[in-house]
Structure formats: structure tokens, C-alpha cells
């Protein structure tokens, strides 16, 4: 049987065929990323065009995409609870992780404590994180948001980078803004401060013991 098509009907047929073909390609791509045979590194997407295409594929499959950003240095239970809550707003959670260079700019020259590669791998091992991308120093606060155009953008109320009113301004790129309070009783900054204090106390004790030992040796000579 020969299918006769002409004019507008022929164009519509090929458009529909292309759409269906793309749909099945998206399914294959998603299985490669999230299926049983996938590995952690397939869920780390640094190429912006690939990230954009992946998000478009997810949305075509009817999935609700959630985006959040942060350093995730010295990951603790507050981070895990925050990411779990963020994931509850949709089907796929994308985490944009600040690079080492960006973290130094934002947090100071002694940060991060944990290097970028390790922070990324820790996040990829968390069950509520689906995709991870790196936010580089040249990226503005809204660059990743504008690229991904998430259905839901999640901010932490503890962030110093953006006020709640400024956060609402990003609604032009996404469907909804959610601002979450801290989900734990500790913070990375507090932990770093405690480690610094403990380190200083230990060093002071060791120096004191060395001085005492040195003075005792002088007295005995």
C-alpha cells in the first residue's frame, strides 16, 4: 500500500514522525543516564549544551525538574535533609556545585575544605540527587537557572548570596521558587570554625609542652 501525501499533510506527517522519533531517542538517552547500567559519572554533566538537552529530554518525558545550588563542603545531615526536601518538589533534582575557584571567591581562600571532585562524588552517591553540574567562577548566580529553566528552583534561606526578594526575581526563568529553612542543627561554616578552634587549641598545647620540655632541659644542663 502506498501512502500518498501532499502539501500541508505531508509536512504534518514528517513533523509528527520527527517528534515521535525524538521522543524514543529521549527514552534511550534517559535509560543510559538513569537505567541499571548507568554509572555515577554519566550523571555529572559539565557541558552546558548537553545539560540543556538533557533537561529538555526530561521535560518531554513529562518529568518535573528541580534545581538547587551550593558548595556542599563537609557534607552533613542538614545537607542530606535539604536535598531530600528539594527532591520532593519534583521528579528530577539537579544540583549545581560551586567549583573550588568559585568557593574561594565566595567563602574565602581557605575554602573549600573538601576538593571539588570529592564533593561531586559525595553528592552523586546521595539517593535524592539525580544530576550534578559544576558552577564555575565565571557563572553568574542566575546563569545556570536561565540555562536549565527548572520547574522549581530551590534556595536555602541561610544563603548570603541572594535575599528572598531577589530570589523571587528568578521566577522569570522557572515555574516556581521555593525557599527552604536550614534542615539541620549544624552548618558547614560552624563545623569549619570548630575545627579551626580545636586545631588552634591542640597546637597551643603542643607548643606549651615543647617550651616546658626545653626549659627543663636548660635547668638540667
Predicted regions and their residues:
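Nucleotidyltransferase catalytic core that binds NTPs
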Residues: 3-6, 13-221
Amino acid at each position: 500500500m502506498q501512502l500518498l501525501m501532499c502539501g500541508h499533510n505531508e509536512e504534518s506527517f514528517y513533523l509528527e514522525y520527527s517528534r515521535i522519533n525524538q521522543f524514543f531517542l529521549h527514552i534511550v538517552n534517559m535509560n543510559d543516564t538513569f537505567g541499571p547500567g548507568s554509572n555515577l559519572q554519566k550523571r555529572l554533566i559539565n557541558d552546558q549544551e548537553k545539560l540543556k538537552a538533557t533537561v529538555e529530554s526530561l521535560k518531554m518525558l513529562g518529568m518535573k525538574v528541580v534545581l538547587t545550588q551550593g558548595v556542599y563542603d563537609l557534607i552533613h545531615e542538614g545537607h542530606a535533609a535539604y536535598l531530600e526536601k528539594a527532591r520532593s518538589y519534583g521528579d528530577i533534582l539537579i544540583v549545581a556545585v560551586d567549583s573550588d575557584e568559585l568557593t574561594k571567591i565566595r567563602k574565602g581562600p581557605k575554602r573549600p575544605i573538601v576538593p571539588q571532585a570529592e564533593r561531586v562524588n559525595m553528592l552523586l552517591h546521595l539517593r535524592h540527587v539525580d544530576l550534578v553540574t559544576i558552577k564555575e567562577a565565571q557563572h553568574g548566580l542566575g546563569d545556570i537557572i536561565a540555562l536549565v529553566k527548572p520547574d522549581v528552583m530551590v534556595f536555602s534561606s541561610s544563603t548570603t548570596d541572594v535575599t528572598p526578594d531577589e530570589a523571587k526575581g528568578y521566577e522569570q526563568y522557572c515555574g516556581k521558587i521555593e525557599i527552604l529553612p536550614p534542615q539541620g542543627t549544624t552548618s558547614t561554616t560552624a563545623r569549619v570554625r570548630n575545627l579551626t578552634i580545636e586545631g588552634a587549641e591542640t597546637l597551643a598545647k603542643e607548643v606549651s609542652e615543647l617550651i616546658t620540655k626545653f626549659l627543663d632541659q636548660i635547668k638540667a644542663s
